[in-house]
Amino acid sequence: MARKTPLKRYRNIGISAHIDAGKTTTTERVLFYTGVSHKIGEVHDGAATMDWMEQEQERGITITSAATTCFWSGMAKQFDEHRINIIDTPGHVDFTIEVERSMRVLDGACMVYCAVGGVQPQSETVWRQANKYKVPRLAFINKMDRVGADFYRVVEQIKTRLGGKPVPLVIPIGKEDDFEGVVDLVTMKAIYWDEASQGMEYDEREIPAELQEKAEEYREYLVESAAEATEELMNEYLENGELTVDQINSAIRQLTIDNEIIPLLCGTAFKNKGVQKMLDAVIQYLPAPMDVPAIKGILDDKDESEGTREASDEAPFSALAFKIMNDKFVGNLTFVRVYSGVLKQGSSVYNPVKMKRERVGRIVQMMANSQEELQEIRTGDIAALVGMKDVTTGDTLCDEQNVITLERMEFPDPVISLAVEPKTKADQEKMSIALGRLAKEDPSFRVHTDEESGQTIISGMGELHLEILVDRMKREFGVEANIGAPQVAYRETIRNTVEQEGKFVRQTGGRGKFGHVWLRLEPMDPAGDVLYEFKEEVVGGTVPKEFHGAVDKGIQERMKNGVLAGYPIVGVKATLYDGSYHDVDSDELSFKMAGSIAFRKGFMAANPTLLEPVMKVEVETPEDYMGDIMGDLNRRRGMVQGMEDLPGGTKQIRAEVPLAEMFGYATQMRSMSQGRATYSMEFQKYAEIPKSVAEAIISKFNNKDDDE
């Protein structure tokens, strides 16, 4: 089968935003104008096409990133038909992992901002993730028809809060109820969309006289920015003071792909104005798969050297599984992004992470929540494979003769845990299956059994995250569960360097046990990338080489269960530098025990402390409740980092607050502000716990030990 759409006409994009910026409505309009859905689905009435999980439609927020394919040839049919694969990403901070994994497989992104709310905390998180994966992006300032909409304020915030260089391609004609359309700064024409045809038709007119001066000022900035793309353009601009439309467009495209600028558009998706222009910008300025650097990976050779895969159908097949989902009708769906080569239905792929071959049953293309079966997928495609048995998010699938392992995604450790048990004993097995499936879909969700209490513990990125998973268990698997009080994921670490001896000697009739080590323990940054390091500086064979691994193992096992209060230990560098052994009695177990003993004693001598997760909290409140809310944050051991005035007499407070103090905050905040304040929270860092709080946690742990 030949390729239907040339690769240069592919756009793999994500539409990403803060919760209420109107991202789902924007995506709906995209699907409407590109002809996929003939009736526009509104979030208000729970009918949006992309929000296909029941809870999403109920809560009006997007949780999972559904992938959808559509086609666009421009507002005036001025382009050849382009294929746009859209990955819809959630905007709630508890689902940051979803954003992270979709960013990994995108070539470009559309950031949607609310013209009233502007750049919000989640927007900053998404921006950081886009920076991490170097995703070229454009921005769409939505809700221009809302009271308090201010295009120019949001442009300023993108500069100051996100550190981007926004270059408006349009400016709004009117605002709030009087928002009528936009001035296109490239062609210097005013565009008005026709309301009767839901924005399918539009008019081009002369720029309104009152906007002429502003349009010229912003046009000059646009041309100046474009001229910076190359030296030739800059010379031409300095000579003639102008560039042609084609020169501007190709320069803006180059600068966007190089992540130098953020082209900016605006409109109101709800009133069907401006999304059409955004689609044109996706085609004009965002990259095709071959415009971004070739994907890197580790080759399957002796040196595990680094290799790349060019975006070409001729290259060996390589793809990344970025999402696993359960479908009632077809079972397991593995969403993949194809980076190179071709995959046919019924053929086999190799998973180098699991070292397994798997046969591909069916390949389906998702159209929001309907599916179309495909015979093959090629470079640049995003589709779902049915029936993959042992693939997890982040795994590579490739050609067995040309193995490559693409860079894996980094998944954050959970910060909150709950005990969960089925309401009826009969549901125990069903609950285990349900939790296993949910954990396979979502790498930031973990399940384990507490060895002491025998309880099932689930861990995730926030209260809402776990609430929704418990809810899904009930809906999709028919398991009702009781949940316990939330538990915080504390950590233990040390502050000083110590040297410590550890000896394990057992003498019973016959062969005994003998292990003897000296360890140096040094603190490392508990927030760094490396949380534990083991070094060997043994001179003269005082501890034989074959036992070094056992010492390391003994230390790591002790670190898992903590010393101070039973929490995992992080930020320690352990050096084995001396010891002794016995020809007959020494074995691996003896040295494992000696390592564990030395570590435990050394840890307690190295000024140990507890760390707790600290959250970045942003509260937006009417000024009248400001004092109460600030006082409450202080009572919760919060540190206020800054404040900002928002339109309409609203204040924004930014603070860092320990997670342990944030349980039940939503209820408290609502009652203090009569339901008018809103807040968002995301994990910021691990920080040392004040002595009095730490002592309470440690004594609780010691009492539990005494009871047992």
UniProtKB/Swiss-Prot annotation:
One Pfam family here? GTP_EFTU
**GO cellular component terms listed in the entry, alphabetical order:** cytoplasm
Q: Which residues bind GTP?
A: 17-24, 88-92, 142-145
tr-type G domain mapped to chain residues:
8-290
Report which superkingdom the organism of origin falls in.
Bacteria
> Where is it mostly found?
cytoplasm
What processes in GO biological process is this protein linked to?
Answer: ribosome disassembly
For molecular function, the Gene Ontology terms on record are:
GTP binding; GTPase activity; guanosine tetraphosphate binding; translation elongation factor activity
Q: State the UniProt keywords alphabetically.
A: Cytoplasm, Elongation factor, GTP-binding, Nucleotide-binding, Protein biosynthesis
The family annotation for this protein states: Belongs to the TRAFAC class translation factor GTPase superfamily. Classic translation factor GTPase family. EF-G/EF-2 subfamily.
Q: What does this protein do?
A: Catalyzes the GTP-dependent ribosomal translocation step during translation elongation. During this step, the ribosome changes from the pre-translocational (PRE) to the post-translocational (POST) state as the newly formed A-site-bound peptidyl-tRNA and P-site-bound deacylated tRNA move to the P and E sites, respectively. Catalyzes the coordinated movement of the two tRNA molecules, the mRNA and conformational changes in the ribosome.
Output this protein's name: Elongation factor G
Q: Which organism is it from?
A: Psychrobacter cryohalolentis (strain ATCC BAA-1226 / DSM 17306 / VKM B-2378 / K5)
